[in-house]
Amino acid sequence: MSQIKFLFVMDAEVGAPLENGEGIIVLDHEGAHYVVDALISNELYRSHVFAPEINWYLKQTQAEHNEKNEILKKLYEMRFIRYNYAPKKTHAVTVDRTVLMIGESEEALALVESAKRYFDVTHVLPQELLSIEGKFGSFTAHFNQKSEEEGEMKEQESEVCCSQLVVCDQLSELSKHRGVECVMDYSDTDALLKRIRNRIGHYEYKKTITYDATHCMYHHHEKTACSLCTDICPTFGLVSDETRKELIFSALDCIACGKCVSVCPTGAIDFAPFPQKAFLEVADFCQGKKILLIAEAYLKTLEGCELPSGYIPYVIETDPFLSLLHLKALFEKSTHTVLFYAPHIGEATHEALKTLNEESLRTCHQKAIELVQSKEAFEAYMTLTCKNDAVCKKEIENRQRIQHG
């Protein structure tokens, strides 16, 4: 059987606004069980890409049948564009059970003993450590090891190779590497051990950032003030070589937060899972619609909230990558105020919102983006919007009635 491009699995809760023959294969759960290969689906039945926004939209929307049908098709196409542009190549590192633990407190010693149940542990005191090099899966630590020879304590330099590291007693810059954890970042040591355990084996990752040096204000510029991306990066996924004036990217250490994308003033850095070109193509499907901009992780938070007719969810992987360009594009496509649900936003996104709203209020006499940061705020905004729409509709009807005498 050839691959099914779009699969919709219906159940009693979401129904089936579509019928077969409209570009989407519609099956019940029993039928979907026999599907060999589907590219995009509203369920996890043997699909390459799961689109949770589809079921979410059908459960929350107040739209009539025809509008549901229209939006549903758009959601599949929007996901397809994201899939087409996203990186396909997978990289991998082998992670064995070797762990280096650095610490000297009683808590550190207790953690070392606990970790020995699961890992091949080497314990080093902070004052013994000389240097650490390498990367996740293949770190090498150099340290002084004391030993007694002929009644005298002597030090000799030793080294140990390990896949992961744990810093027990203090916060450390080392934790910017993937595979290095600080105990102080965890309230529960069991959670820490579980995280380390889950990485053992074949660890896969993909490229998360793309870069065009020709547009970079740092690359080979002797006199440059731009260091926005390296300043905001929370890991060693992006660092600068001050001697060569070049940026160095590590897909292995990158956590795909997208913060570097949001602050880049020239667009030299782009978010590989959802690049600007794809973002703009997806925005075309929102022409004239009211947009709910929301990260995929927050869909569950808004379950049970009504989504009025006319709204289309614009779902993104994460929101810190959003820049002024992204937000402005959505507003221009929609022409309505874009509703942006995000419990937390970074400083760069906040500044982009402020700049865009000031401009739109000055030129269009309306806000471009309305930020809501809680479920209660979302519901309050929707209630107010629906009331205002009803008032406007009534005023228009009254004017038409007067005009036609």
Q: What positions do the PLM features span?
A:
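Ferredoxin-type iron-sulfur electron-transfer modules and their immediate structural context
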Residues: 1-232, 236, 288-305, 365-405
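Iron-sulfur cluster-binding cysteine motifs and their immediate structural context
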Residues: 224-248, 259-276
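Long hydrophobic segments that form regular secondary structure
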Residues: 230, 237-238, 242, 308, ...
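A contiguous, basic/glycine-rich beta-loop/short-helix subdomain that forms a polymer-engagement track
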Residues: 271, 275-287
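Long, compositionally biased charged/polar accessory segments in the mid-to-C-terminal portions
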Residues: 309-322, 333-344, 348-350
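Short acidic, glycine/proline-enriched helix-loop-strand junctions
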Residues: 346-375
